[in-house]
Amino acid sequence: MKNLMIPALALFLSAAAQADDSPLWMRYCAISPDGQTIAFSYQGDIYTVPSSGGKARQLTTHPAHDTRPVWSPDGQKIAFASNRSGNFDVFLMNKEGGEPKRLTTHSTNEYPTTFKDNGHILYLANILQDAKDIQFPGTRFMQVYEISTDGGRPDLYSSLYMENIALSKDGSKLLYNDYKGYEDPWRKHHQSSITRDIWLCTLGKDRSFQKVTTFGGE
């Protein structure tokens, strides 16, 4: 019996080692502004890795879930969401890691989506304001808020639910995907009337919207 257990144990350890060498479920990849580094979340922590390849560096080690990293325009800061205080809040840390700073404190979940500039972050939240102040009242649809990297009181940036926002360098336009109804974003090959589309928004006094994609899938 002992002779049978040794090969089985060796096979198990070999499989475990192979699994460690080929990690899966790395999510929310974000390329640094200079294109040299990729930030991503893996098993509840934030990592960075050179875009040319190499060993990943772990930036957060908290037992809570850290996810959705986004870079500041100068590439010196990374904002991310963490539920280390109960619900998900927006945190800010240096690109090398270190002690992060908590920026939001609302009781609902909040997720960073992009930096407006080096001093301001746009994030998604559902603060449940009065119906007159939001596009679609309810708990399912979030709004876009803006907060300083120093913290403080957030401002409503858009009552329209915008996901995966990308601002142009001059800040005059933004790309985003819409949200028509609930669908698992990780579902593959989904096509229906509620799949997300990409839109281009021209900011300014006369704000305009242009639909970029018409594909029936995500």
Region spans (language model):
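Sec/Tat signal peptide C-region and signal peptidase I cleavage site
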Residues: 15-19
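An edge-strand/N-cap motif at the start of beta-rich repeat modules
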Residues: 21-39
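Blade-terminus and WD-like Trp-Asp/Gly-His loop motifs, strongest in beta-propeller folds
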Residues: 30-35, 69-77, 112-121, 165-173
